[in-house]
């Protein structure tokens, strides 16, 4: 009997999902992206070689895996072709192993232009988007005016829709944001220069998935970003534009919630966040700088430095609630090597003095929130690359156990380095 497993971030993204997806893909037939776009940077280190995937599922590096892009993903033709070119230059067969839902909304140049214009206009109050047009593309989807992959099959109808949409966007870009308009003919020509390649990969993703389940093969769903960036459940408005939570598997791939057998939440042994928004345990001292330096905390897509802080059990408890998380994979434990003491946030003190154990929903409700910490002893031993659980320092084992107690979910996988071999699988999601 095959298993269906979802892997998702349980913090603010950048938890190390790409490595874990790649690690587990030797067990599966299909790897599926179900939300987000090329704003997701999944970094893989295999035999010392670094690969960053932004749009194509991480399973593409395994020859026996078919990769699917579900309807919940916003697809940039330009980004797709660039990523395909990079992979094919390395000898990886993409075109025969990548299938795309025809219901995917397209990201086009006017979405990118609008993204940049809005962030520039907001100034210091900007959301902190990646500037890749993700939000505006999702806006068009909800407004029911967006162009989709299916529209590539009729160039004349596509051109008519494109003209109407560009009239709307260019009016705003020129008259409100005072920037250059997007050229209609260039946009049309650029899209249709690659349309045949994309059309050749179109498939009924939902039917493929349900056939695979009937056949008893393993399926892995690859989430992007993190739970606390979810459009509905994150620190709104400092969120992404898609559902980064387990529910996105149903809406973004047509695979119902009862069909998921296991949800693996990825957590760092500490916390990071890119961009603006609440971050209760953020460190502004030497400890934060040390974590950032040792953890190489820079965005895979943007290169922006990540904000760093202590592990926030309150936020992760919220992720457990929202996603029905079965087990965790903890990454970057080795980054905490050498700290004399470590802190875990166990509760929040609200501005009115109330002590709460669950995270607020809206960003405004985080204002004035103070972390309540529990201090634990650190360890001086080196844990980098350790692959036997019993070989870890006792203080590290105690730290992991305490986090398990606070969030109510076991750590089933432990990562002590960037390479796929630097991992301990304590309980296999496809066997559990």
From Swiss-Prot:
Pathway info: Purine metabolism; AMP biosynthesis via de novo pathway; AMP from IMP: step 1/2
Location of the protein in the cell: Cytoplasm
* Top-rank EC class of the record's enzyme: ligase
Q: Which UniProt keywords apply?
A: Cytoplasm, GTP-binding, Ligase, Magnesium, Metal-binding, Nucleotide-binding, Purine biosynthesis
**Chain residues that bind substrate:** 300-306
Which InterPro entries does the entry mention? Adenylosuccin_syn_GTP-bd, Adenylosuccin_syn_Lys_AS, Adenylosuccinate_synth_dom1, Adenylosuccinate_synth_dom2, Adenylosuccinate_synth_dom3, Adenylosuccinate_synthetase, P-loop_NTPase
Q: What are the EC numbers?
A: 6.3.4.4
Q: Which residues bind Mg(2+)?
A: 14, 41
State the oligomer form and interacting partners: Homodimer.
As for what it does, the entry says: Plays an important role in the de novo pathway of purine nucleotide biosynthesis. Catalyzes the first committed step in the biosynthesis of AMP from IMP.
PANTHER family, sorted: ADENYLOSUCCINATE SYNTHETASE
Can you name this protein?
Adenylosuccinate synthetase
Q: Which organism is it from?
A: Haemophilus ducreyi (strain 35000HP / ATCC 700724)
For this protein's source organism, the top of the classification is:
Bacteria, Pseudomonadati, Pseudomonadota, Gammaproteobacteria, Pasteurellales
In the UniProt record, what gene is named as encoding this protein? purA
